[in-house]
Curated annotation (Swiss-Prot):
Belongs to the glutamate 5-kinase family. PANTHER family: GLUTAMATE 5-KINASE (PTHR43654), ISOPENTENYL PHOSPHATE KINASE (PTHR43654:SF1). It is an enzyme of class 2 (transferase). Catalyzes the transfer of a phosphate group to glutamate to form L-glutamate 5-phosphate. This is Glutamate 5-kinase. GO terms for biological process: L-proline biosynthetic process. Residues 278-352 form the PUA domain.
Length: 366
């Protein structure tokens, strides 16, 4: 067994993301038998000593049958109506299933905005930490009833990766209707399972298919989430929900994604992956070398242009001369102030304007 699989198998804190297809039937509504089997596997892992946070899809799918709908709606209003009905059913089903073991569950509904805004980010973190301390099972889902962008393709996979870093998890397990990553379309019979992904180069030529009939997150979404988590220092296991027992027992199934050696700090992870980008700073080649290679602060002299309207404390993207993003960071000045000082050396500026535009501690190269 690889070192990554051993790390996942022995992880003291795990986030388990469960896709819609693993929880709902083809005609809509929850499949209680599947859900109970997943709860059994999670309970076994918790009894073995691990803390587990569950990121559960399925609200929209669970709301279809009660509303007389036979397929996933395309319009936002109907999706949100289905989510409002299904969320109740989903929370009740998880609560009933874990009650067999005397476990209490807590529902945590999040939107991307809750992760992107620093204050809400910290509040969500404290809530999840407290639920774990009280030995309750946190059932996390997107707040689909009020969200807009969050109902787009694959967002719950990304949410799971963000939650994994939010709670300081030692591993992320993605469970769905696929049993791992293949080098081609497994439905065509000539594809080979990729047991471990060590770097982005391992994904060259890999075909990312679409999601299932009831889900929104296809393989491309899962790969993106796995890369995000692994880049943040969290190893990932992608496996079939039907193999949940083995996945959570010894990580001996599916595809494992090797994490980077060091974990990003909570603040730098937030800057790089969670915060909304409010504007753009265009920088010259010298500034690119200073920021990316030498990991130094961004000074006004290296900025050639400003795009967007933003304020001190906002997160912006830094683009090099080829217009490609090279870093993200927290700016010290408003966009109007930067426009007045860009291209100037520090010595040309008044004392109160001699701080770096983006300090090295607030910069994250991409």
């Amino acid at each position: 067994m690889s070192a990554t699989r051993r790390t996942i198998a022995s992880a003291g804190s795990i986030v388990v993301k469960i896709g819609s297809s693993a929880l709902t039937s083809l005609v809509g509504g929850l499949d209680v038998g599947r859900l109970d089997a997943l709860a059994d596997a999670i309970e076994d892992r918790m009894r073995a000593g691990s803390d587990v946070v569950v990121v559960s899809s399925g609200a929209v799918g669970a709301g279809l049958a009660p509303l007389g709908l036979t397929k996933r709606p395309r319009d936002l209003a109907t999706k949100q109506a289905a989510a409002s009905v299904g969320q109740l059913a989903l929370a009740h089903a998880w609560g009933t299933s874990f009650a067999r073991y005397g476990r209490t569950v807590g529902q945590v509904l999040l939107t991307a905005d809750d992760i992107a805004r620093r204050a809400q980010h910290r509040n969500a973190q404290r809530t999840l930490d407290r639920l774990r301390a009280l030995h309750a099972v946190a059932i996390v889902n997107e707040n689909d009833t009020v969200a807009t962008a969050e109902l787009r393709f694959g967002d719950n996979d990304r949410l799971a990766a963000l939650v994994a870093h939010l709670v300081g998890a030692d591993a992320l397990v993605l469970l769905s209707d696929v049993d791992g990553l293949y080098d081609g379309d497994p439905r065509k019979g000539n594809a080979t399972l990729i047991p471990e992904v060590n770097s982005p180069e391992d994904l060259d030529g890999v075909v990312a298919g679409s999601g299932g009939a009831l889900g929104t997150g296809g393989m491309a979404s899962k790969l993106s989430a796995a890369r995000l988590a692994a880049d943040a220092g969290v190893p990932v296991l992608l496996a079939a929900a039907s193999d949940a027992g083995a996945a959570l027992r010894d990580a001996g199934v599916g595809t494992a994604f090797v994490a980077r050696p060091s974990r990003l700090s909570a603040r730098k992870f937030w800057v790089r992956h969670a915060a909304d980008e409010q504007g753009i700073l265009h920088i010259d080649e010298g500034a690119v070398r200073a920021v990316v290679t030498k990991r130094r602060s961004l000074l006004p002299a290296g900025i050639s242009a400003v795009s967007g309207r933003f304020y001190g404390g906002d997160v912006v993207s830094l683009l090099g001369p080829d217009e490609r993003p090279v870093a993200r960071g927290v700016v010290a000045y408003d966009s109007a102030e930067i426009s007045d000082i860009l291209g100037k050396s520090t010595q040309e500026l008044p004392a109160e304007m001699q701080r770096p535009v983006v300090h090295a501690d607030d910069l994250v190269p991409l």
